[in-house]
């Protein structure tokens, strides 16, 4: 079994992933931004769940907008467990509204959480993984960088940046025996606080200028609900199950990308072609080594 650090485990996909891995016997460092404050209830509930499972749970505070926080969380894993095998990048936040109405601070803040946050955690974890010449980075991304729905502009941009960072980082860390898997969930309107906890644009004056579109924005949740077969609803558990499945695969056999999309938007086909095109270009450049795991 592996020692796994997961970001953003208070709700949704992160919570389901922590529970699934605990049920399989892994040692899980379930991190939350404020485990002793606003996330204390979630931490307590996860602790109660873990009490009857074969895995070992450790709750840790981790704010992905702070390098010091990321460093401290990873160092705690090393100090207590002796090693770190897997990092699951899951922490993220949603903004809904008119793109023009998001200030530069709004956009910077979302990119900081959804993209730069994973980079901070990598900077904390990779020295240990490189030293062992093994490990796995799992990125919980989104199909949204392909489907690009309206009224979610900054979120789309942040998830595209997150995906790009995952790809370019994979080239380099593969040469130290570190695998990368990007799991791309489709929309999951229920079972998370993603939509209910979404932030809005700060510029009220610009937002008011788009008032004619307010009725469309109000349909965002309904529109996403309509994507799914009532018999096959989108569920955070389906994503958690895929992360868990990937971690059971032998070294060198983990998929670089896996799409988990109950909406069946065809993103798997798009990304398969995109990755083939990217890999072909990297080979044309003469850097084919970075596409292979160096053991």
Give residue spans per PLM region.
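Active-site loop of short-chain dehydrogenase/reductase
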Residues: 2, 83-84, 129-143, 176-179
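Conserved glycine-rich cofactor-binding loop
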Residues: 10-11
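The beta1-alpha1 cofactor-binding region of Rossmann-like NAD(H)/NADP(H)-dependent oxidoreductases
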Residues: 37, 61-72, 104
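A glycine-rich helix->loop->beta "capping" turn
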Residues: 54-56, 76-89, 95
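Substrate-binding pocket helix/loop in short-chain dehydrogenase/reductase
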Residues: 98-99, 106-108
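Active-site helix of classical SDR
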Residues: 122, 158-161
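SDR active-site lid
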Residues: 175-254
